[in-house]
Amino acid sequence: MHTDNTALAESPGPAIDLDSLYAAPAERIQKAVRDRLSDFHEAYLRQASFFCLATAGERGLDASPRGGPPGFVQVLDERTVAFADWPGNNRIESLRNLQADDRLAMLFLFPGLDIFLRINGRGRISTDPHLLQELSEGRGTPKTATVVLVDEVLLHCGKAIHRSGLWNPSSQLDRSALPTVGQMMAALTQLADATAPAMDAAQQEQANAHYAHAVRHDLY
């Protein structure tokens, strides 16, 4: 049973005076926000293997994961970085959003480290053959790349990592504790059409196997 809290989320209410609740950031933190990459930013990017990409479009906002070998986000110069778009679910919300609104944000996580790197900027989609070749992985060449003009870059403290225990081995989830892909597909099929044939256990296991293979091997 879920309580409907829609009104709580949608009702704006009176404006909250945030400055009365939160202290101003320290001067050193404000000065740490730069409009271009420094050598230490580039050092982190050379080791970066995962980030979340936030974009906005006519239909709303999206956040999408991006991953690759260390350095898959290439530094083109102190104001510009680029990364490839590799196969996913083909929803391509981020790409469509960037065609309507070029603003984006990137949040980098570094395995084992308690620090984040953030980039706010503007992105454009490129099909430049030379750039795509530079961003290729093995025998895979991306169809498109996103070129980012950096407006802001900063390192962000990793308190959230410690609050969550993200890198702690004891925090790793037991896969059996949550529904499988096959089980969720079966439920979604019934939610979309109650008259549709239900997926049996064998079909659910087939979906699980297909997903497990795809996320590990169909990378490029």
For each predicted feature, which ranges?
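Binding-site signature for planar aromatic cofactors or substrates
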Residues: 1-220
